[in-house]
């Protein structure tokens, strides 16, 4: 296999682990190539030019080469323009990164999801100027993640007749099928939503308090289905703090 070289690819660092004495192995989310594993040689050295650049939640341009699954980072440039995440926003950022690591296979491109992630990190970094709250920002990202990875059925159509839900009626989300009217023998853990909320969620509109509340249950349910037994540490912390 020929060695591949990629230059100046937009990326964010999702996670990093030490490698040997002076290097790091990075899990990065790139716009065109999806999740990539890169080794940053010498990045732990005190005077390394990479050390101050490889920060989470900051837009980067990265270059790499190699032919194995673990490529070698050859350059990383900080793009700038985003304030650092702090407080609750920082915890939410770690939650987003954990979701991406759990959901996305390596080297599958998700350009739309990358753009949504960048928009979400920007919103979190400028939270004081945002009209949306933390929950609304997170719900929009979770929905995009489920849609772009193919884990969410259509919310604006009933599976039984392919018609739009009626605003005042109640519906459940049935695993492997999608939205349908509530029945008396439905399992208690299936999320129940009004047609109004389903139609709003389908267009990523979480501005109504009832929709936001019902969407929280739906997103937890859908994420849980596909994460199965995998535990999201940051999500549990946020739940305990009643932030999501």
Swiss-Prot record:
Q: Supply the SUPFAM superfamilies for this chain.
A: ArfGap/RecO-like zinc finger (SSF57863), Nucleic acid-binding proteins (SSF50249)
Q: Which InterPro entries match?
A: ARFGAP/RecO (IPR037278), DNA_rep/recomb_RecO_N (IPR022572), NA-bd_OB-fold (IPR012340), RecO (IPR003717), RecO_C (IPR042242)
Gene3D superfamilies to which the protein is assigned, alphabetical: Nucleic acid-binding proteins, Recombination protein O, C-terminal domain
Please verify whether the record's keywords include DNA damage.
yes
GO BP annotations, alphabetical order: DNA recombination; double-strand break repair
Keywords for the protein's UniProt record, in alphabetical order: DNA damage, DNA recombination, DNA repair
Pfam families in the record, alphabetically? RecO_C, RecO_N
Could you name the Gene Ontology cellular component terms for this entry? bacterial nucleoid
Taxonomically, the superkingdom here is: Bacteria
Presence of the UniProt keyword DNA damage in the record: yes
Q: What NCBIfam families does the record point to?
A: reco
Q: Which PANTHER family match?
A: DNA REPAIR PROTEIN RECO (PTHR33991:SF1)
General function of this protein:
Involved in DNA repair and RecF pathway recombination.
Q: Which family does it belong to?
A: Belongs to the RecO family.
Q: What is this protein called?
A: DNA repair protein RecO
Q: Which organism is it from?
A: Polynucleobacter necessarius subsp. necessarius (strain STIR1)
